[in-house]
Amino acid sequence: MTDVPALRRGLAVLRVLAARPGPISAAAIARELDLPRSTTYHLLAELEAAGFVVHLAAERRYGLGIAAFELGSAYLRHDPLERLAAPLLRKLADRVGHTAQLGVLHGNELLYLLKERPSAPETLVTDVGVRLPAHLPASGQVLLAYLPHAHVRALYPRSFVTRTGRGPTSPAELRQALAAVRSRGWAVEDGQVTADFASVAHAVFDHNGRPLASVAVTFRHVCESGCTRTWPDLAQETATTAAALTRQVGGKPPPTTR
């Protein structure tokens, strides 16, 4: 193997291991990557020597090594998601004239990482570092919508809190809301976090097509119901930004995403 193809194949092995819930056999890796077994064992040996793979001989399986953990930890220290998202969110806020935010899931809560305001900002209760129940803001709903059903059930086994009396209050209502998000391709909430404010959001996906973060626009909503006709326009703007960030982090949308 020459250096460049070998490097690409080695990285592909690491991605396969990272996508699995636990260690797997060399044969499984070879099948998934359509590689000869001899090539797979050679790659695994090199990765093991470098500390990126650990061989569990008793189980005849391979898992990620400590070097992979160290690399992941270094990635987090560099705050790459926030650094990549900041200029995109600034442009989004300027285009739509509303506050743009980046959020991530922490259990059943939505944590805001970034907030970019337009030149004439509106006062919001959400800010960087603020956590909210993930089932209320559009930012959280769009992430929950792309999680496995069993994961969502584990996060929400019973009834949950509301802030304004709006939003899902039971697992059944949440399932219905998330199904609508998946069908639509984006999430929307009206007054579930703060009265007289609404938001729309799209998901950012990682290289496995899993929800990584959300891009949202929040705006004051005090008008007749007819003003909702502008929401698809705002949703398209968030979709453009979320898709750009997905590409920049090396991600891809899941096959079912519209």
What are these regions (language model features)?
Residues 58-158:
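Amphipathic alpha-helical effector-binding/dimerization core
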Residues 3-7, 61, 65, 78, ...:
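Short, structured helix-loop boundary elements
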Residues 177, 184, 195-196, 212-258:
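Juxtadomain coupling helices with adjacent low-complexity linkers
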Residues 204-207:
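Sensor-regulatory modules in signal-transduction proteins
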Residues 1-83, 243-251:
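N-terminal helix-turn-helix
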Residues 84-92, 155-201, 247-248:
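Short, basic/aromatic recognition patches
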